[in-house]
Amino acid sequence: MTKQIVLKLLREHTEEFLSGEAISRQAGVSRAAVWKAVEQLRQEGYGIESVPNRGYRLTRVTARLRPEELAEQFRDCRIGRELLCFDTIDSTNNELKRRAVSGSVDGTVILADQQTGGRGRRGRSFVSPAGKGLYLSAALRPQCPLSEISTLTAWTAVALCDAVEAVCGVRPGIKWPNDLVLNRKKLCGILTELEWEAESGEFSCVIIGAGINVSQDEADFGPEVAPIAISLAQALGTAPDRTELAARVIRSLNALYDDFPAQNAAYLECFRRDCLTVGNPIKVISGAGERIGTATGISDDFGLTVRWEDGSTETLTSGEVSVRGLYDY
Protein backbone atom coordinates (compact mmCIF):
# COMPACT_ATOMS: atom_id res chain seq x y z
CA MET A 1 0.00 0.00 0.00
CA THR A 2 2.87 2.41 0.83
CA LYS A 3 4.32 1.91 -2.64
CA GLN A 4 1.03 2.86 -4.29
CA ILE A 5 0.65 5.98 -2.14
CA VAL A 6 4.19 7.08 -2.96
CA LEU A 7 3.58 6.47 -6.67
CA LYS A 8 0.33 8.43 -6.54
CA LEU A 9 2.07 11.41 -4.92
CA LEU A 10 4.92 11.34 -7.44
CA ARG A 11 2.48 11.14 -10.36
CA GLU A 12 0.68 14.21 -8.99
CA HIS A 13 3.95 16.22 -8.90
CA THR A 14 5.78 15.28 -12.10
CA GLU A 15 6.81 18.89 -12.77
CA GLU A 16 8.56 19.32 -9.44
CA PHE A 17 10.57 17.50 -6.82
CA LEU A 18 8.77 16.17 -3.78
CA SER A 19 10.85 15.88 -0.64
CA GLY A 20 11.10 12.65 1.29
CA GLU A 21 9.78 14.50 4.31
CA ALA A 22 6.70 15.71 2.42
CA ILE A 23 6.01 12.23 1.07
CA SER A 24 6.50 10.75 4.54
CA ARG A 25 4.06 13.23 6.04
CA GLN A 26 1.37 12.83 3.38
CA ALA A 27 1.67 9.05 3.25
CA GLY A 28 1.79 8.69 7.02
CA VAL A 29 4.90 6.49 6.95
CA SER A 30 8.55 6.80 7.91
CA ARG A 31 11.29 8.22 5.67
CA ALA A 32 12.80 4.74 5.53
CA ALA A 33 9.51 3.36 4.23
CA VAL A 34 9.46 6.06 1.54
CA TRP A 35 13.00 5.14 0.44
CA LYS A 36 12.06 1.45 0.31
CA ALA A 37 8.95 2.21 -1.77
CA VAL A 38 11.00 4.30 -4.22
CA GLU A 39 13.49 1.45 -4.66
CA GLN A 40 10.66 -1.01 -5.30
CA LEU A 41 9.19 1.29 -7.94
CA ARG A 42 12.57 1.62 -9.64
CA GLN A 43 12.89 -2.16 -9.77
CA GLU A 44 9.51 -2.28 -11.51
CA GLY A 45 10.77 0.02 -14.25
CA TYR A 46 9.75 3.48 -13.05
CA GLY A 47 12.23 6.29 -13.62
CA ILE A 48 12.56 8.24 -10.37
CA GLU A 49 15.14 11.01 -10.10
CA SER A 50 16.48 11.81 -6.64
CA VAL A 51 18.45 14.94 -5.72
CA PRO A 52 19.82 15.69 -2.23
CA ASN A 53 17.90 18.44 -0.42
CA ARG A 54 15.25 18.46 -3.14
CA GLY A 55 13.66 15.02 -3.06
CA TYR A 56 12.19 12.74 -5.71
CA ARG A 57 10.65 13.28 -9.14
CA LEU A 58 8.95 10.78 -11.45
CA THR A 59 10.54 10.88 -14.91
CA ARG A 60 9.19 7.71 -16.52
CA VAL A 61 6.36 5.28 -15.86
CA THR A 62 6.98 1.58 -16.25
CA ALA A 63 5.94 -0.13 -19.46
CA ARG A 64 4.65 -3.03 -17.38
CA LEU A 65 0.96 -3.40 -16.70
CA ARG A 66 0.16 -2.15 -13.21
CA PRO A 67 -2.89 -4.13 -12.07
CA GLU A 68 -2.73 -2.75 -8.53
CA GLU A 69 -3.45 0.74 -9.89
CA LEU A 70 -6.39 -0.56 -11.89
CA ALA A 71 -7.78 -2.52 -8.95
CA GLU A 72 -7.73 0.63 -6.83
CA GLN A 73 -9.65 2.61 -9.47
CA PHE A 74 -12.40 0.08 -10.12
CA ARG A 75 -12.99 -1.68 -6.80
CA ASP A 76 -16.46 -0.07 -6.54
CA CYS A 77 -17.43 -0.37 -10.22
CA ARG A 78 -19.59 -2.93 -11.96
CA ILE A 79 -16.76 -3.90 -14.31
CA GLY A 80 -13.31 -4.30 -12.81
CA ARG A 81 -14.26 -4.84 -9.18
CA GLU A 82 -12.53 -8.19 -9.62
CA LEU A 83 -9.46 -7.77 -11.78
CA LEU A 84 -6.81 -10.39 -12.49
CA CYS A 85 -3.60 -9.91 -14.45
CA PHE A 86 -1.46 -12.71 -15.91
CA ASP A 87 2.06 -12.56 -17.30
CA THR A 88 1.21 -15.24 -19.88
CA ILE A 89 -2.06 -16.95 -20.67
CA ASP A 90 -3.56 -18.84 -23.58
CA SER A 91 -6.45 -16.41 -23.99
CA THR A 92 -8.14 -13.91 -21.68
CA ASN A 93 -11.51 -15.04 -23.05
CA ASN A 94 -10.64 -18.66 -22.29
CA GLU A 95 -9.71 -17.79 -18.70
CA LEU A 96 -13.07 -16.12 -18.13
CA LYS A 97 -14.80 -19.16 -19.61
CA ARG A 98 -12.98 -21.41 -17.15
CA ARG A 99 -13.99 -19.19 -14.26
CA ALA A 100 -17.60 -19.01 -15.44
CA VAL A 101 -17.91 -22.77 -14.92
CA SER A 102 -17.24 -22.46 -11.19
CA GLY A 103 -19.40 -19.44 -10.39
CA SER A 104 -20.48 -15.90 -11.17
CA VAL A 105 -17.96 -13.79 -13.05
CA ASP A 106 -20.16 -10.75 -13.69
CA GLY A 107 -17.89 -7.71 -13.82
CA THR A 108 -14.64 -9.69 -13.75
CA VAL A 109 -11.79 -8.38 -15.91
CA ILE A 110 -8.85 -10.51 -17.09
CA LEU A 111 -5.68 -8.83 -18.37
CA ALA A 112 -2.60 -10.49 -19.80
CA ASP A 113 0.85 -9.27 -20.78
CA GLN A 114 1.00 -12.00 -23.42
CA GLN A 115 -1.42 -14.46 -25.03
CA THR A 116 -0.17 -17.70 -26.51
CA GLY A 117 -3.52 -18.55 -28.08
CA GLY A 118 -5.12 -15.20 -28.80
CA ARG A 119 -7.98 -15.51 -31.27
CA GLY A 120 -10.58 -13.55 -33.12
CA ARG A 121 -13.81 -14.29 -34.94
CA ARG A 122 -14.18 -17.60 -36.77
CA GLY A 123 -11.19 -19.06 -34.92
CA ARG A 124 -8.58 -16.80 -36.49
CA SER A 125 -5.41 -16.28 -34.47
CA PHE A 126 -4.59 -12.89 -32.95
CA VAL A 127 -0.88 -12.12 -32.59
CA SER A 128 -0.30 -11.17 -28.93
CA PRO A 129 3.43 -10.64 -28.16
CA ALA A 130 4.57 -9.97 -24.59
CA GLY A 131 4.50 -6.38 -23.42
CA LYS A 132 3.35 -4.99 -26.76
CA GLY A 133 -0.44 -4.93 -26.66
CA LEU A 134 -3.45 -4.59 -24.40
CA TYR A 135 -5.18 -7.95 -24.11
CA LEU A 136 -8.30 -7.73 -22.00
CA SER A 137 -11.59 -9.55 -21.45
CA ALA A 138 -14.61 -8.65 -19.32
CA ALA A 139 -17.65 -10.69 -18.31
CA LEU A 140 -21.10 -9.10 -18.33
CA ARG A 141 -24.52 -10.40 -17.44
CA PRO A 142 -26.91 -7.80 -18.86
CA GLN A 143 -30.54 -7.96 -17.84
CA CYS A 144 -32.15 -7.91 -21.26
CA PRO A 145 -33.58 -10.28 -23.86
CA LEU A 146 -30.95 -12.48 -25.51
CA SER A 147 -31.91 -11.03 -28.87
CA GLU A 148 -30.42 -7.68 -27.83
CA ILE A 149 -27.08 -9.10 -26.70
CA SER A 150 -25.95 -9.57 -30.31
CA THR A 151 -25.45 -5.80 -30.56
CA LEU A 152 -22.77 -5.79 -27.84
CA THR A 153 -19.95 -6.26 -30.35
CA ALA A 154 -20.91 -3.03 -32.09
CA TRP A 155 -21.41 -1.23 -28.78
CA THR A 156 -17.95 -2.39 -27.69
CA ALA A 157 -16.38 -1.04 -30.89
CA VAL A 158 -17.79 2.40 -30.08
CA ALA A 159 -16.62 2.15 -26.45
CA LEU A 160 -13.08 1.24 -27.52
CA CYS A 161 -12.99 4.10 -30.03
CA ASP A 162 -13.92 6.39 -27.14
CA ALA A 163 -11.11 4.95 -25.01
CA VAL A 164 -8.40 5.26 -27.66
CA GLU A 165 -9.48 8.79 -28.50
CA ALA A 166 -9.42 9.83 -24.83
CA VAL A 167 -5.87 8.55 -24.31
CA CYS A 168 -4.28 9.18 -27.72
CA GLY A 169 -6.20 12.13 -29.17
CA VAL A 170 -7.05 10.23 -32.35
CA ARG A 171 -10.27 8.35 -33.03
CA PRO A 172 -10.06 5.05 -34.91
CA GLY A 173 -12.63 4.01 -37.45
CA ILE A 174 -14.63 0.78 -37.36
CA LYS A 175 -14.44 -1.95 -39.97
CA TRP A 176 -17.76 -3.75 -39.71
CA PRO A 177 -18.45 -5.60 -37.56
CA ASN A 178 -15.65 -5.86 -35.00
CA ASP A 179 -12.31 -4.26 -35.91
CA LEU A 180 -10.88 -0.86 -35.08
CA VAL A 181 -8.85 0.66 -37.91
CA LEU A 182 -6.20 3.37 -38.18
CA ASN A 183 -4.57 4.38 -41.46
CA ARG A 184 -6.56 1.63 -43.22
CA LYS A 185 -4.96 -1.07 -41.06
CA LYS A 186 -6.23 -3.15 -38.15
CA LEU A 187 -5.55 -1.65 -34.73
CA CYS A 188 -7.85 -3.74 -32.56
CA GLY A 189 -9.97 -6.86 -32.72
CA ILE A 190 -13.06 -7.63 -30.65
CA LEU A 191 -14.45 -11.06 -29.83
CA THR A 192 -17.73 -11.50 -27.95
CA GLU A 193 -18.79 -14.96 -26.81
CA LEU A 194 -21.87 -16.19 -24.96
CA GLU A 195 -21.53 -18.70 -22.15
CA TRP A 196 -24.28 -21.07 -21.01
CA GLU A 197 -24.91 -22.95 -17.76
CA ALA A 198 -23.80 -26.56 -18.28
CA GLU A 199 -26.68 -28.21 -16.42
CA SER A 200 -29.61 -25.89 -17.06
CA GLY A 201 -28.60 -24.61 -20.47
CA GLU A 202 -29.51 -21.11 -19.34
CA PHE A 203 -27.57 -18.00 -20.32
CA SER A 204 -24.62 -17.42 -17.98
CA CYS A 205 -22.75 -14.36 -19.25
CA VAL A 206 -21.31 -12.67 -22.29
CA ILE A 207 -17.54 -12.37 -22.52
CA ILE A 208 -16.13 -9.36 -24.34
CA GLY A 209 -12.52 -9.71 -25.44
CA ALA A 210 -10.37 -6.98 -26.96
CA GLY A 211 -6.83 -6.93 -28.28
CA ILE A 212 -5.35 -3.49 -28.98
CA ASN A 213 -1.99 -3.18 -30.73
CA VAL A 214 0.03 -0.71 -28.64
CA SER A 215 3.76 -0.85 -29.39
CA GLN A 216 4.26 -3.62 -31.96
CA ASP A 217 6.52 -3.13 -34.95
CA GLU A 218 6.57 -5.06 -38.23
CA ALA A 219 8.77 -7.78 -36.77
CA ASP A 220 6.28 -8.37 -33.96
CA PHE A 221 3.42 -8.82 -36.42
CA GLY A 222 5.32 -11.05 -38.80
CA PRO A 223 5.33 -10.99 -42.63
CA GLU A 224 1.72 -12.17 -43.07
CA VAL A 225 0.09 -9.80 -40.58
CA ALA A 226 2.33 -6.71 -40.88
CA PRO A 227 0.81 -5.46 -44.18
CA ILE A 228 -2.69 -5.25 -42.66
CA ALA A 229 -1.98 -4.42 -38.99
CA ILE A 230 -0.85 -1.30 -37.16
CA SER A 231 0.01 -0.37 -33.60
CA LEU A 232 -0.57 2.93 -31.83
CA ALA A 233 3.20 3.44 -31.73
CA GLN A 234 3.42 3.04 -35.50
CA ALA A 235 0.46 5.34 -36.11
CA LEU A 236 1.35 8.06 -33.60
CA GLY A 237 5.12 7.83 -33.30
CA THR A 238 4.91 6.94 -29.62
CA ALA A 239 3.15 4.30 -27.57
CA PRO A 240 0.67 5.27 -24.85
CA ASP A 241 0.99 3.88 -21.35
CA ARG A 242 -0.75 0.51 -21.39
CA THR A 243 -2.10 0.85 -17.87
CA GLU A 244 -3.61 4.24 -18.66
CA LEU A 245 -5.17 2.78 -21.80
CA ALA A 246 -6.49 -0.22 -19.85
CA ALA A 247 -8.07 2.10 -17.29
CA ARG A 248 -9.81 4.08 -20.01
CA VAL A 249 -11.05 0.90 -21.70
CA ILE A 250 -12.50 -0.40 -18.43
CA ARG A 251 -14.09 2.99 -17.78
CA SER A 252 -15.67 2.93 -21.24
CA LEU A 253 -16.95 -0.61 -20.66
CA ASN A 254 -18.52 0.51 -17.38
CA ALA A 255 -20.29 3.30 -19.23
CA LEU A 256 -21.44 0.76 -21.83
CA TYR A 257 -22.77 -1.56 -19.13
CA ASP A 258 -24.69 1.30 -17.53
CA ASP A 259 -26.15 2.33 -20.90
CA PHE A 260 -27.02 -1.11 -22.28
CA PRO A 261 -29.49 -1.57 -23.86
CA ALA A 262 -31.45 1.64 -23.17
CA GLN A 263 -29.08 3.98 -25.04
CA ASN A 264 -29.06 1.97 -28.25
CA ALA A 265 -29.89 4.97 -30.42
CA ALA A 266 -26.84 6.91 -29.21
CA TYR A 267 -24.45 4.01 -29.80
CA LEU A 268 -26.01 3.33 -33.20
CA GLU A 269 -25.43 6.94 -34.21
CA CYS A 270 -21.78 6.71 -33.16
CA PHE A 271 -21.29 3.39 -34.92
CA ARG A 272 -22.73 4.78 -38.15
CA ARG A 273 -20.44 7.80 -37.88
CA ASP A 274 -17.31 5.73 -37.21
CA CYS A 275 -17.92 2.84 -39.62
CA LEU A 276 -15.44 3.00 -42.51
CA THR A 277 -16.97 0.08 -44.36
CA VAL A 278 -20.03 2.03 -45.49
CA GLY A 279 -19.68 3.60 -48.91
CA ASN A 280 -16.91 1.25 -50.00
CA PRO A 281 -16.79 -1.76 -52.30
CA ILE A 282 -16.53 -5.02 -50.36
CA LYS A 283 -15.99 -8.70 -50.87
CA VAL A 284 -18.29 -10.89 -48.77
CA ILE A 285 -17.00 -14.36 -48.01
CA SER A 286 -19.49 -16.94 -46.76
CA GLY A 287 -20.14 -20.65 -46.97
CA ALA A 288 -21.82 -20.06 -50.31
CA GLY A 289 -18.71 -18.47 -51.80
CA GLU A 290 -17.67 -14.89 -52.55
CA ARG A 291 -19.80 -11.97 -53.70
CA ILE A 292 -18.88 -8.43 -54.65
CA GLY A 293 -20.98 -5.46 -53.62
CA THR A 294 -21.02 -2.04 -52.03
CA ALA A 295 -21.75 -1.37 -48.36
CA THR A 296 -24.54 1.20 -48.29
CA GLY A 297 -25.38 1.61 -44.61
CA ILE A 298 -25.90 0.25 -41.10
CA SER A 299 -29.34 -1.04 -40.16
CA ASP A 300 -31.05 -0.25 -36.85
CA ASP A 301 -29.79 -3.56 -35.42
CA PHE A 302 -26.19 -2.86 -36.56
CA GLY A 303 -26.41 -5.07 -39.64
CA LEU A 304 -24.56 -4.12 -42.82
CA THR A 305 -26.72 -3.25 -45.80
CA VAL A 306 -25.17 -4.23 -49.12
CA ARG A 307 -26.04 -3.55 -52.75
CA TRP A 308 -24.83 -6.42 -54.91
CA GLU A 309 -23.47 -6.09 -58.42
CA ASP A 310 -26.80 -7.28 -59.85
CA GLY A 311 -28.61 -4.40 -58.11
CA SER A 312 -30.25 -6.47 -55.38
CA THR A 313 -29.84 -5.50 -51.71
CA GLU A 314 -29.36 -7.46 -48.51
CA THR A 315 -28.71 -6.80 -44.82
CA LEU A 316 -25.91 -8.92 -43.37
CA THR A 317 -25.43 -9.90 -39.74
CA SER A 318 -22.06 -10.21 -38.09
CA GLY A 319 -22.30 -13.95 -37.58
CA GLU A 320 -22.78 -15.08 -41.16
CA VAL A 321 -20.02 -13.53 -43.26
CA SER A 322 -16.51 -12.19 -43.34
CA VAL A 323 -16.15 -8.80 -44.95
CA ARG A 324 -12.93 -7.65 -46.57
CA GLY A 325 -12.36 -4.28 -48.16
CA LEU A 326 -11.37 -4.60 -51.79
CA TYR A 327 -8.67 -1.98 -51.29
CA ASP A 328 -6.09 -2.08 -48.51
CA TYR A 329 -7.55 -3.56 -45.33
Regions found by a protein language model. Give the residues of each.
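N-terminal lobe of the biotin/lipoate ligase/transferase fold
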Residues: 2-166, 188
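Catalytic beta-strand/loop module used to bind and position nucleotide/cofactor moieties
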Residues: 3-8, 20, 26, 106, ...
